[in-house]
Amino acid sequence: MCANFKPLTLAQLEALGLTEIPFEYSDEVYPNYEMPLLFRSQQGLEWRKVCFGMIPKWADDLSIALKTYNARNETLMQKPTFQNSIQKCKFGVIPVSEFYESKYIDNKPQRWSVRRKDGKAFYIAALYEICQKGEDIIRSATMITMDAIGHAMMKEFHEPGNVKRSVIVIPHDRLEQWLSWKSSNIQSFVDGFPVEEFECSFAPKIKIEKISPQLNFFD
């Protein structure tokens, strides 16, 4: 399960040749945070600020996003939370610099980062939803996941056992195909990312100390 990641940077955005993102977003994202989503509209590729975690039309409590940030590709059609989006082929991508997973060392979880070796951003497959709650338009999205028990890198993460999951990475040369896909059958996209193009390393959270008035971090 991926619950934490860093969105792409401005330099990575420019390297991909994508249009400017017209809103601000956090350097690091967790469930129920806002994040940038790329999708295809009738006008072409567009950015939207969405909630990380699917908020279906029937949900009364927006905090459901804390539980719906990942969606198993195997059960998308069976889960009420994701049915509407998969049936209407609301496919998007979440461009990221790196994402984080828990690796258990001596039965204790450590935070590890996964990223491309070449430093480029990459696209994580997503489903999105748009619904109205009162006078508010709510936009949200979830990362689609796959079984990773046979993936050389991703099988090392998560709690010990036989359940291993991974996000689905959409190759750069299949981006347009994914965003324009018109079928609920997405099996042709369910593939583990090429291990030789990625790397991972221990990435402990940095504790932010209380800022002293005497310190100037811009010097």
Language-model features, listed with the residues they occupy:
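Short linear sequence motif anchored by a di-proline
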Residues: 1-219
